[in-house]
Amino acid sequence: QTFVAGAFIVLLLAAMYRLRGVNAEEKKLRPVLLAVLIAATALRIGLAATNTGYETDINCFTAWGQIAANVGPANFYSEGFCDYPPGYLYVLGLQGLIGNLLNLTPGSAAYLVLLKLPAIASDAAICYLLYRMGCRAGKPSWALLAAAAWAMMPAALLDSAMWGQIDSVLALLILLVLDA
């Protein structure tokens, strides 16, 4: 739980840091965007803690994270079943290490939040990126509307916070490329 709170604070500080140096209309919208980010992230954390998710994937993510944490990435694919490429397994391995360090019980609310945290953080980053991209197009109020729509879109809430899917991680990477 401490890790979740710390990650949430870091995410908020990063968002606030990126919001500096903007025009007058954007400056007026900052508190609203921050409120949207806080509300959306808090809602996702609450949903993540209270929903088991898509059990097959959650169980696989848990097992793969613990295996990666115990045997390391070099020996991960030597035994057992895994249908994920190596990239995200580094994230799962880190989650397994954190879960072990914090003595979290797999399946507990805290462990569920830990597993879903990369997707939740990606959702928040997508929200901010949509806002930033819209502001660059010269439409801060429309940018805020797009960010808020993403933040509270039921499909995004269901996918990341409730089911524990990581589609938003890839979506974030695609948006970062488009924003570059």
Please identify what each model-predicted range represents.
Residues Q1-G46, C135, A143:
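Start-transfer (signal-anchor) and selected internal transmembrane alpha helices
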Residues T2-L11, L117-A125, S168-L173:
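Membrane-embedded alpha-helical segments of multi-pass membrane proteins
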Residues A40, A146-A151:
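Short helix- or helix-capping micro-motifs
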Residues D57-G87, L94-T105:
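Extracytosolic helix-loop segments that constitute the early lumenal/periplasmic catalytic or substrate-binding loops
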Residues S78, P85, K116, L129, ...:
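Catalytic cores of eukaryotic secretory-pathway lumenal/extracellular enzymes that build
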Residues V113-G138:
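Transmembrane-helix motifs of polytopic, lipid-linked glycan transferases
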Residues L129-R132, V169-A180:
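Specific aromatic-rich, kink-prone transmembrane helix
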Residues A161-D167:
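Short acidic/glycine- and proline-prone juxtamembrane loop motifs at membrane-interface regions
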